[in-house]
């Protein structure tokens, strides 16, 4: 047994000396991904060999960029009667050399050709023009399809000296697709061919397709996701770009002019080819403030569709939690990692950047809430006069505090109710229950958040 231990120690000493004096170079991300690709690794090597053979060093560098960050890229499709079966196809196992080479060559062609993107650095080009995919859509020839479809138009705009902004909104006005509820039945990120077939899509589909069209002619268009609006329900997807003069623009993908409803969101996340897949860009859109709370390990949530939804975790240091870049003018709920209230009151982050914490309830004090309406965004909803509606107040969670039948088809009255400072009205149907927004009373006025 002692002899066995001696040999183990000796082998360990030999291994240590070999590691110190003859170190083995660690596997690079490029080598790792080619290995992870298995049999398909030869397709990736073909791409690199192609550009070595042609002597195009810059294209080879950019091909390396794509392969290095390819390990987290995949197509996700759905099958089954109700599209219940999710199929994930990693790009490392599926991508072909010819496909990647064509994408790289076409991306370089527009980068070198059109004035609106010639100022981009190689790094900016790699991040905002070069990628062959944006999200988890199928691997397809969208770049070739849209470039050859719109090449003549883009050439004419370039000859006329059009700016990046002019090109974007010319295309949106002339060729923009429509929002269609028909596309809601499809799960996941759609093929560009399906979007062309149905003539449009949801916000997410249209933002993806707009980026495909624009990048095919050298416009570095971003896809920016708003998981939740701040004062209305649901979420959204914007497109954005920074023009030749460094000015930031954002718009809905179906807008025909550079204007939009300025619905503030608590967080905006930009989709990236690199890892991590999302980059927070809220401060590019809205005035923001850092908020510090006197407890550790907190998250911050927003209220959307009847639930508290975590926006992001905070950063804990010295027993305190800091939330970076919170949009001003919105209502926030401090929660734990499971989205449960933790005793810290919600707060409204003022336009001056100062948190205004919701005061504790005063149940012994009563208030009158008269002439109340229910809304779908800004549209007043018709009430069911035979149904009861519930008023809830916040006290480390929503508490039922009163009920009422409608006074008429549009109006509710809640008389002599406990003063809970933060309220929400719940209806008897899921739609009405989920769509109502919290509100506070400011004097005799109702202010919704």
Language model features with spans:
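Compositionally biased low-complexity segments at domain edges in trafficked proteins
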Residues: 358-398, 448-449
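Short amphipathic beta-strand segments in non-cytosolic proteins
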Residues: 296-315, 388-403
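Hydrophobic membrane-insertion alpha-helices, especially the h-region
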Residues: 6-20
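Hydrophobic/aromatic-rich core segments of domains that either
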Residues: 26-31, 158-169, 173, 182-193, ...
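A short, amphipathic beta-strand motif
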Residues: 283-293, 300-302, 310-313, 333, ...
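Short Pro-Gly-centered beta-turn/loop motif in secreted/extracellular proteins
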Residues: 320-339, 409-429
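Secondary-structure boundary elements
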Residues: 29, 35, 42-46, 54-198, ...
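Structured interaction patches on ligand/partner-binding surfaces of diverse proteins
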Residues: 338-364, 428-449
């Amino acid at each position: 047994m002692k002899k066995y231990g001696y040999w183990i120690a000796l082998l360990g000493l030999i291994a240590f000396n070999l590691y110190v004096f003859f170190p083995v170079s660690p596997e690079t991300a490029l080598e790792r991904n080619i290995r992870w690709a298995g049999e398909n690794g030869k397709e990736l090597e073909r791409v690199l060999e192609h550009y070595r053979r042609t002597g195009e060093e810059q294209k080879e560098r950019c091909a390396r960029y794509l392969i290095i960050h390819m390990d987290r890229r995949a197509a996700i499709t759905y099958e089954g009667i109700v599209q219940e079966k999710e199929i994930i196809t990693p790009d490392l196992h599926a991508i072909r050399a010819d496909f990647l080479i064509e994408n790289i060559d076409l991306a370089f062609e527009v980068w070198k050709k059109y004035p609106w993107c010639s100022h981009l650095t190689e790094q900016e080009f790699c991040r905002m023009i070069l990628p062959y995919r944006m999200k988890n859509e199928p691997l397809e020839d969208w770049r070739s399809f849209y470039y050859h479809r719109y090449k003549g138009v883009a050439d004419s705009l370039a000859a006329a000296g059009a700016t990046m902004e002019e090109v974007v909104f010319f295309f949106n006005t002339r060729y923009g697709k429509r929002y269609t509820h028909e596309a809601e039945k499809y799960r996941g990120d759609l093929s560009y061919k399906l979007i062309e077939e149905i003539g449009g899509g949801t916000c997410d589909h249209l933002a993806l397709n707009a980026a495909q069209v624009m990048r095919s002619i050298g416009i570095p268009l971003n896809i920016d996701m708003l998981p939740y609006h701040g004062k209305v329900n649901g979420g959204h997807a914007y497109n954005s770009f920074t023009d030749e003069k460094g000015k930031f623009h954002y718009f809905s993908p179906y807008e025909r002019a550079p204007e939009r409803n300025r619905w503030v969101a608590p967080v905006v996340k930009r989709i990236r080819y690199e890892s991590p897949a999302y980059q927070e860009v809220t401060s590019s859109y809205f005035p923001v403030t850092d908020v510090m709370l006197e407890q550790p390990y907190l998250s911050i949530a927003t209220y959307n569709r009847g639930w508290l939804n975590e926006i992001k975790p905070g950063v804990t240091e010295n027993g305190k939690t800091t939330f970076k870049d919170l949009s001003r003018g919105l209502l926030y709920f401090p929660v734990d990692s499971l989205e449960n209230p933790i005793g810290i009151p919600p707060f409204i982050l003022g336009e001056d950047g100062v948190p205004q914490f919701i005061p504790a309830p005063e149940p012994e004090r009563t208030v009158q809430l008269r002439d109340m309406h229910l809304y779908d965004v800004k549209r007043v909803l018709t009430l069911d006069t035979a149904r009861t509606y519930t008023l809830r107040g916040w006290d480390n969670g929503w508490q039922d505090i009163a009920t009422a039948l409608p006074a008429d088809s549009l109006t509710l009255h809640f008389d002599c109710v406990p003063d809970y400072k933060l309220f929400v009205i719940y209806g008897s149907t899921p739609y009405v229950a989920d769509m109502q927004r919290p509100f506070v009373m400011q004097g005799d006025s109702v202010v919704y958040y």
